[in-house]
Design a protein with these regions (language model features):
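ADP-ribose/adenylate-binding Rossmann-like module
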Residues: 72-92
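Rossmann-like NAD(P)-binding element
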Residues: 43-72
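NAD(P)+-binding Rossmann beta1-loop-alpha1 motif at the extreme N-terminus of oxidoreductases
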Residues: 1-39
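Short loop/helix-cap segments at secondary-structure boundaries that form the rim of catalytic
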Residues: 27-35, 47, 90-96
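Redox-cofactor binding/interface segments in oxidoreductases and associated redox assembly factors
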Residues: 54-55, 80, 124
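Rossmann-fold dinucleotide-binding core
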Residues: 85, 89, 93-147
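An accessory alpha-helical subdomain
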Residues: 149-258
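Short acidic-hydrophobic, aromatic-tinged amphipathic segments that line or gate anion-handling sites
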Residues: 37-43, 148-152
Length: 258
């Protein structure tokens, strides 16, 4: 469902080993899809009788599209999503009576090199259909992804940390930045990140930040900024040295500091 960036990625990934069809209301978006059937009506899906349906539409429409298409699916069909935010998904899935599997490829096409994913991660929700989980585990392993299994709740806690902190940091950078005719390397790198984040769907950004676990993460940023501003205002050299030592120690498991 959906022929956007991730929908097209899954079509390319699956179409040479499986019989694949793509549904997209806007037929023009399917112009560059290959080796698959192209549908624009739910009746075509009904005749196709899919064994697995991957919902790759914009986050805002994930559940509404499920509600529309489920009446046209075989009872044994596994329904699945790849949404970045899983709020309300567990309750929805359990209300349908359908087999389901939920995953989150954490390498959106905005930043990742889709030809080289060995440094990227994917989450498979541990709740749901066993065979569906096995299918996606095999698929993601073939891509060389690092795979983690979380419950719906654990997933949303992870997303609150791994997405909200960099997103909010980018928002702050974009809010205060001024155009630079001759930007330095660090500035240009931040600009590239800002370009990627700010080109994301507004609803996706909103839902990530409205995640119930996000507030405490953002509050931590505010606390750190307050401490750093006090050090700057006081020109506290010892305090700055201590602060730099603290943050280097905080990231030493993930970043090599020379």
């Amino acid at each position: 469902m959906g022929a956007g960036k991730m929908g097209s990625f899954f079509i390319d990934l699956l179409s040479f080993e499986h019989e694949v069809a793509v549904f997209e209301r806007d037929a023009k978006r399917m112009r560059f899809t290959y080796n698959c059937q192209r549908f624009t009506t739910y009746e075509e899906i009904e005749l196709f009788k899919p064994e697995l349906l991957i919902n790759a539409v914009t986050l805002k429409y994930t559940i509404p599209v499920f509600k529309e298409v489920i009446p046209y699916l075989p009872k044994e069909c596994i329904i699945s999503d790849i949404a970045s935010v899983k709020t309300d998904m567990k309750e929805f899935y359990e209300s349908t009576g359908m087999r389901y599997v939920s995953t989150h490829p954490m390498f959106g096409p905005t930043f990742a090199n889709l030809q080289q994913l060995s440094e990227e991660n994917a989450i498979i929700i541990s709740e749901g259909d066993y065979m569906g989980r096995i299918f996606f585990k095999d698929l993601y392993q073939k891509l060389g992804l690092n795979i983690y299994e979380y419950t719906f709740e654990e997933h949303d806690k992870t997303v609150a940390y791994s997405l909200s902190i960099p997103f909010v940091s980018t928002f702050v950078f974009a809010a205060v930045m001024k155009h630079q005719d001759a930007p330095g390397t660090t500035f240009k790198r931040h600009m590239r990140i800002a370009k990627g984040v700010l080109n994301e769907d507004d609803y996706l950004l909103q839902e990530i930040l409205f995640n119930p676990y996000t507030h405490d993460q953002v509050a931590q940023i505010r606390t750190e900024l307050k401490e750093l501003l006090e050090i700057i205002d006081n020109k506290d050299a010892a305090g700055m040295k201590g602060y730099l030592t603290k943050i280097r120690n905080n990231v030493k498991r993930d970043i090599e500091i020379k």
